[in-house]
A protein has these predicted regions:
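Aromatic "clamp/platform" in nucleotide-sugar-dependent glycosyltransferases that forms part
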Residues: 335
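Donor nucleotide-sugar binding/catalytic pocket of nucleotide-sugar-dependent glycosyltransferases
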Residues: 189-239, 247-248
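Short alpha-helical donor nucleotide-sugar binding micro-motif in glycosyltransferases
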Residues: 314-315, 322-327
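A conserved mid-protein helix/loop that constitutes part of the nucleotide-sugar donor-binding site
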Residues: 69-70, 251-274, 284, 291-297
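Short hydrophobic beta-strand element within catalytic cores of glycosyltransferases
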Residues: 352-355
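Conserved acidic donor-binding segment of nucleotide-sugar-dependent glycosyltransferases
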Residues: 367-368, 372-379, 388-393
Length: 426
């Protein structure tokens, strides 16, 4: 992907952005250019907003999640925006919604339940769009709500720009059901754009659809400085964890997430069993809960890992950030994962991160720099990557804020995203 935009005093007012979308090989060049041009890019959008009214944006999204807050706040700053959520919490898991809403820079609104009990049949969107008269609408994935937006566009406002946010990994995109493929075809044809969270998926879309200018890239990430401040504030709790679990001198592996089948956690324990004799100081912290917890505890005991595995339960807020501070090597072993927002959190916390190749968040890993990738079907592959990480990992000595391991910052990604977006909506 490459972006060229104007720098001279006269050219700063132009709206003719040149955007082309390519694969991962050129992502580094793009984002490094965003680093050099960061001030110019921000000033360009600032001037554009000063001379022109902000465009009206309506966002329809399933729920408020911690890994979306910064993105929503950025949209709210860039547009005259209003946000409607379908549910009071994320369906698959529960978050502390009161604290999350305290981080929002806007007032959230919530849609009425779906008609006839169908969750995405939200006919209320018609009255909202008639009232708000937006220039741009964001929605999520491929579903009935998105089709309702198209009906409104066809009947009342052909100029309406509609974008959907799709979290699919490449594997999920390739294995889509017939119904999803049909919905995706309609969206690609009639929407203004699709926001993808993985650059390999973007390349896949470009290859399979003749509409490359419609595909935008923005991973699921949080603001570096804000998240790292949360980590810093959690350091006293981290020191308590060090004492509670006797972690000093141990090589601390970390998993954060639900203890469910798709996370592939028996596989992780089996891979750990292959290396633990060579690295007897290794200890794996499971932070999360789920229906496999008891079975995982028994599996760890049967495989001689009782002294090398700790089940901490589900944690949120400061209690969760404290675990990122003590973790040295983070592992996401999922065999099915749309993205994996925990990878961004682990990298921001300075954890060397081992990520399954099927997770969308694999795009955040720079092998041999901030982590590595592995095949979630090969125990020996993960065991080798664990051994490499442990070989370079000293035991935990001092609880402190580790260096950020994200390759690029939130600001770099969001500037690039808004330049892509503005090239489409004008």
């Amino acid at each position: 992907m490459s972006i060229d935009f104007c720098h001279s005093a006269t050219e700063e007012l132009c709206s003719d952005f040149s955007v082309s979308f390519v694969g991962k090989s050129e992502k580094r060049g793009l984002l490094e250019n965003e680093t050099r041009d960061e001030q110019g890019g921000l000033e360009l959008r600032k001037n554009k907003t000063y001379f022109e009214m902000k465009k009206k944006l309506v966002v329809f999204h399933p729920a408020i999640a911690p890994y979306r807050v910064d993105f929503f706040n950025s949209l709210n700053k860039e547009f005259d925006a209003i946000f409607y959520f379908e549910f009071g919490d994320v369906l698959e898991q529960s978050f502390a919604q009161d604290k999350l809403r305290g981080r929002l820079k806007f007032v959230p609104h919530f849609l009425a339940p779906g008609l006839f009990g169908i969750k995405n049949l939200r006919t209320q969107v018609f009255s909202i769009l008639r009232k708000e008269q937006p220039n741009v609408v964001f929605c999520s994935e491929y579903n009935i709500l998105g089709l309702l937006l198209l009906v409104y566009k066809f009947l009342f406002n052909w100029k309406l720009s509609i974008f959907t946010i799709c979290d699919d990994s490449k594997e999920i995109a390739e294995s889509a059901t017939l119904v999803k493929r049909c919905m995706r075809f309609i969206v690609v044809k009639f929407y203004s754009g699709i926001i993808l969270t993985n650059d390999d998926v973007l390349s896949w879309y470009v290859k399979h659809f003749q509409a490359k200018q419609k595909f935008l890239f923005f991973p699921i990430i949080q603001k570096d400085q804000d998240f790292r401040l949360l980590l810093e504030n959690a350091l006293p709790v981290s020191k308590m964890l060090e004492d509670t679990y006797h972690l000093r001198g141990r090589q601390v592996l970390l998993f954060v997430g639900r203890l469910i089948d798709i996370k592939n956690l028996f596989f992780l324990l089996d891979a750990l069993a292959l290396v633990v004799d060579r690295y007897p100081k290794a200890v794996l912290l499971f932070v999360g809960d789920g229906d496999q917890r008891v079975a995982l505890e028994r599996h760890a005991e049967r495989n001689g890992l009782a002294d090398h595995v700790i089940f901490a339960g589900k944690k949120q807020g400061k209690d969760l950030y404290a675990y990122y501070n003590v973790g040295q090597i983070f592992v996401l072993p999922s065999y099915y994962e749309r993205f994996g927002a925990v990878v961004n959190e682990a990298l921001l916390a300075g954890c060397y991160t081992l990520c399954s190749v099927v997770a969308g968040a694999a795009c955040l890993i720079e092998p041999q720099k901030n982590g590595d990738l592995f095949d979630p079907a090969s125990k020996t592959d993960l065991a080798e990557k664990l051994a490499e990480g442990l070989e370079d990992c000293e035991g935990l000595r001092q609880i402190s804020l580790k260096a950020n391991k994200m390759g690029y910052s939130y600001d770099q990604y969001i500037i690039s995203f808004f330049n892509q977006l503005n090239s489409i909506i004008g």
